[in-house]
Amino acid sequence: MAVDVPTSVIVKLMFFTLAMVSFPVLTFFVSQQYTSNTLVNGGLAALAANVVLFAYVIMAFSEDVPQSDGKESKKQQ
């Protein structure tokens, strides 16, 4: 039972997966250049992960939902 998933959904998922892995790690190591406190570096990396997560949630809620024909809504009533 294969489901046709739009390519735009796959592209968004791959982008945010890559961002969720690379952005916090990059933030951690870049912030190490400015401070040697690993607690601050870890906190900034966690903040970067939350930024990516919130961006994904906002994009998911703003995504267009395909309109169905009226047949399903009549069945539910």
Swiss-Prot record:
Residues 30-41 are lumenal. One of its GO terms (cellular component) is endoplasmic reticulum-Golgi intermediate compartment membrane. It is found in: Endoplasmic reticulum membrane; Endoplasmic reticulum-Golgi intermediate compartment membrane; Cytoplasmic vesicle, COPII-coated vesicle membrane. Pfam families: VMA21. The lineage of its organism: Eukaryota, Fungi, Dikarya, Ascomycota, Saccharomycotina. Required for the assembly of the V0 complex of the vacuolar ATPase (V-ATPase) in the endoplasmic reticulum. Keywords: Cytoplasmic vesicle, Endoplasmic reticulum, Membrane, Transmembrane, Transmembrane helix. Belongs to the VMA21 family. One of its GO terms (biological process) is vacuolar proton-transporting V-type ATPase complex assembly. The keyword Endoplasmic reticulum applies. It is a multi-pass membrane protein. Residues 1-8, 63-77 are cytoplasmic. InterPro entries: Vma21 (IPR019013). The chain crosses the membrane at residues 9-29, 42-62. The gene is VMA21. This is Vacuolar ATPase assembly integral membrane protein VMA21. Signal peptide: none annotated. A motif (Prevents secretion from ER) lies at residues 74-77.
